[in-house]
């Protein structure tokens, strides 16, 4: 499965933004231990973008060589994992959570399943609650919302807005 259109994305603070024109291919969840560590999570959702249709439109990511053949791109300011770049490949992988609209790309496969946490299949059965129902309730949710410095899910001319930092 591949999807054809224009995708934009970036880090949480807005220092790094990117654009993909055309197809995002092979959307998947990678459970390998390297991706777990790189994401600080149980898996890393990725999809590949052809290099010639991929562009960094703002800032410059930091890069970490996780092996001789792979580097991982991230925001140096906020730490958001953004890219998995197998250097010899004709594409770069973007992290699906960094897309401006992550609902646009649904994973179709799982990789690195030998490292998948054993209780992964049980996640959908966990109790659920809205953001404002957690610790601190509505008051905490309002304080976070009103002081939010997260970049919006669309391109802006500059970020952050004047006087917000």
Where are these regions (language model features)?
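A short Gly-Trp-Pro
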Residues: 1-165
